């Protein structure tokens, strides 16, 4: 019987939890602010990890840029803390990527909501 998850998937889940804790408790850079780790992708040999993040204030482009610069600057420190927290032979090289899927999802949801409202208005006007 085949295993349900690959090891890289399990490691990615654990990295996501650990990095979320590290960002919340250990990293004190004011540029980073309120950041959420939305997903982690780990290479099959566990040497690289892409960490997808979102920020609380997604509408402010400069805050996002500053937050990403802060994360990039802190990545060696975060990697060292990750190595201490996890028992891995090789701690993956981490790269932070801004996750726009949440913002795009909200934009699409707003578009659908607006279309539904306009459609309801047309039906109300037609019935009168």
Curated annotation (Swiss-Prot):
Keywords from the UniProt entry: Cytoplasm, Ribosome biogenesis
Function noted in UniProt: One of several proteins that assist in the late maturation steps of the functional core of the 30S ribosomal subunit. Associates with free 30S ribosomal subunits (but not with 30S subunits that are part of 70S ribosomes or polysomes). Required for efficient processing of 16S rRNA. May interact with the 5'-terminal helix region of 16S rRNA.
Subcellular location field: Cytoplasm
Official protein name in the record: Ribosome-binding factor A
InterPro entries tied to this protein: KH_dom-like_a/b, RbfA, RbfA_dom_sf, Ribosome-bd_factorA_CS
Cellular compartments per GO CC: cytosol
Subunit note: Monomer. Binds 30S ribosomal subunits, but not 50S ribosomal subunits or 70S ribosomes.
Signal sequence coordinates: none
Domain of life of the source: Bacteria
Predominant place of localization: cytoplasm
Similarity comment: family membership: Belongs to the RbfA family.
Spans traversing the lipid bilayer: none
Alphabetical GO biological process terms: maturation of SSU-rRNA
Single annotated GO MF: ribosomal small subunit binding
Source organism of this protein record: Haemophilus influenzae (strain PittEE)
């Amino acid at each position: 019987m085949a295993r349900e998850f690959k090891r890289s998937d399990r490691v990615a889940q654990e990295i996501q939890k650990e990095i979320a804790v590290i960002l919340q408790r250990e990293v004190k850079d004011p540029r980073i602010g309120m950041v959420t780790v939305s997903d982690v992708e780990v290479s099959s040999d566990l040497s690289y990890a892409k960490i997808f993040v979102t920020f609380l204030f997604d509408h402010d482009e400069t805050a996002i840029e500053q937050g990403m610069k802060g994360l990039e600057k802190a990545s060696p420190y975060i990697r060292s803390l990750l190595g201490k927290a996890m028992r891995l032979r090789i701690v993956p090289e981490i790269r932070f990527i801004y996750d726009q899927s949440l913002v795009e999802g909200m934009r699409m949801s707003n578009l659908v909501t607006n279309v539904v409202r306009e459609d309801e208005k047309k039906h109300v006007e037609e019935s009168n």
